[in-house]
């Protein structure tokens, strides 16, 4: 199964999508697409129709709380709203930027997430709640995926310790191929979009895709890009029975 998580950088606005967005999604051909730093609204009816046209017919969106960004999940397979909630946090940013779904046909669960740009005590409280939410799912076939605003491969980066701790506990937190997932206006690249998979699933490959067919998916040049974040593409292993597999089945 191919999973794609993409931060669209809407910054709490119902921004228009780049004309290159839909062709990119068509070429990426995900089985499940998660959009974060995204805002849903009346203008998105065409987006939902377009996603259906490329096979992503099943769509769920997190509730927008206090004007925060949201998460949209679109899938080739039926989705069922899950019960895991985002961490309680300042102005409900953690709750709004979080969506848990189930994919019954593949005995699989997915959480789209974006860590809000908190600081100080607000950031500490958010991460405490997020880690609690992740750890309570340790026995499930589940992936958390999106913009975590940290990099586990840079130990000195704020909150890297949390993703590193999950690795130590047996969660799969791969280091994706590619140089960066976010690029600043001054062209400084960082790797802050990640996947966290339970030990009951196996990730075959993870990568950041910054360009596709000559189109810039992510760039510091606003006029030419889809976003300032590259899509994170994750390939989950499947068993011979067509179900998502782990190392033990």
Predicted regions and their residues:
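N-terminal, active-site-proximal structural segment of metallo-dependent hydrolase catalytic domains
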Residues: 1-53, 65-71, 239-249
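Active-site-proximal beta-strand elements of phosphoester/diester hydrolases
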Residues: 1-11, 100, 106-117, 145
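Active-site neighborhood of phospho(di)ester-bond hydrolases with catalytic His/Asp-centered motifs
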Residues: 33-36, 60-62, 143-147, 172-177, ...
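Catalytic metal-binding/acid-base residues of hydrolase active sites
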Residues: 7-9, 38-39, 78, 114-116, ...
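Metal-dependent phosphoester-hydrolase catalytic domains
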Residues: 84-85, 139, 150-249
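Active-site environment of divalent metal-dependent phosphoester hydrolases
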Residues: 10-13, 40-44, 66-68, 118-120, ...
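His/acidic metal-ligating clusters that form di-metal
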Residues: 127-145
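Structured beta-strand-rich core segments of catalytic domains in phosphoester-bond hydrolases
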Residues: 32, 37-115
């Amino acid at each position: 199964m191919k999973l794609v998580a993409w931060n669209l950088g809407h910054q709490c606005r119902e921004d228009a999508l780049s004309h290159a967005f839909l062709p990119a999604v068509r070429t990426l051909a995900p089985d499940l697409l998660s959009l974060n730093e995204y805002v849903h609204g009346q203008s998105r009816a065409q987006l939902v129709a377009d996603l259906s046209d490329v096979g992503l017919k099943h769509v769920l969106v997190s509730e927008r709380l206090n004007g925060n960004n949201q998460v949209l999940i679109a899938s080739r397979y039926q989705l069922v709203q899950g019960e895991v909630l985002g961490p309680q946090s300042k102005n409900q940013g953690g709750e709004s930027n979080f969506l848990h779904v189930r994919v019954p046909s593949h005995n699989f669960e997915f959480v789209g997430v974006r860590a809000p740009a908190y600081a100080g005590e607000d950031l500490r409280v958010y991460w405490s709640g997020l880690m609690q939410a992740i750890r309570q799912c340790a026995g499930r076939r589940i992936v958390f995926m999106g913009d975590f605003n940290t990099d586990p491969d840079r130990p000195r980066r704020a909150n890297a310790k949390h993703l590193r701790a999950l690795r130590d506990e047996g969660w799969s937190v791969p280091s994706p191929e590619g140089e960066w997932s976010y690029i600043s206006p001054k062209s400084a690249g960082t790797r802050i979009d990640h996947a966290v998979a339970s030990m009951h699933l196996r990730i075959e490959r993870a990568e950041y895709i910054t360009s596709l067919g000559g189109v810039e998916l992510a760039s510091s040049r606003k006029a030419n890009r889809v976003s300032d974040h590259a899509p994170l593409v994750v390939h989950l292993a499947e068993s011979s029975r067509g179900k998502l597999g782990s190392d033990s089945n």
